[in-house]
Amino acid sequence: MSGYVGRLAPSPTGALHLGNARTFMIAWLRARSCGGKVVFRMEDLDHPRDKPGAAAAAVEDLRWLGFDWDEEYVQSERRAVYRNALARLDAYPCICSRKDVTSAQSAPHAGEQLFYPGTCRGRFASWDEAAAACAPRIPCWRLRVPDGTTVRFDDAFAGPYEQDVSRTLGDFPLARDPDGAGYTLAVTVDDLLMGVTEVVRGDDLLPATPPQILVARQLGHAPPAYCHVPLVVGPDGRRLAKRHGDTRLAAFRAAGVSPEDIVGWLAYTCGWNAKKTPTRLQSLVGRCPLETIPHEAVVWNGSFT
């Protein structure tokens, strides 16, 4: 087995759909095609949005399509890991609401990230003090970002990417949790400790990458490589949602669609099949180059044929 370690990281906030399946397929094939390892991680820290039964359903859907993995983790069982990592970071509690942050800067243009000016830097001695000051709201942890902090990396699919984090984001949020059990901190720590060598995910998460790289560096580690691939969208160009019909993998299975039909269509959208031919996932191992994947979003028109 090579030293490559990839990961599949679904969240139980909803059912897996075609877009998830395409990204996971690329991630899985990147690992298996070089004899690498696949880590499965359930990212279940967003408890208010978690759907009952969604975690088990995600495992069932992926197994049905032909996925397998070598290690399995659940983030909600790893709070002590995140707490220990948080203690090593230059982080502080912040009580500013989104409205506070927005009003502290000139009006951002659509799509721009919010810049945080450091209002709560040095303001509170502890999380508990901050929590008392903003009750019943919950504070968040922010990472202190020194002036002149720019992150540059080469994405395996999207190419060179650069962001001056100190000027565009400022001290960015890590987690809204006393133990640091939130997305930015948790995924970064887990990727490091699980030995993930490349993160393959949707290109909507490309802007989330520079903060994660900074967290990794503050923890004294080199970050993994990254590969951000286009999403599957509806005919209106917007990411898949109920307005585009039922694109849940479970719904296709219930309707009698075979896993080979789905994998074949996904392979066709990646340029790995010349036609929308039913295909087993395992048969794509070793014939899944990134170079044939279009750089535009994939449009789902409602049919696998």
What is each model feature region?
Residues 1-112, 203-204, 208-221:
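N-terminal Rossmann-like or analogous alpha/beta NTP/dinucleotide-binding catalytic cores
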Residues 43, 74, 96-98, 228, ...:
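Proline- and acidic/polar-enriched loop/turn elements at helix boundaries
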Residues 60, 84, 88, 103, ...:
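Charged/polar, solvent-exposed surface patches and flexible loops
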Residues 100-241, 248-253, 301-304:
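Active-site cores that bind ATP or allylic diphosphates and position pyrophosphate for catalysis
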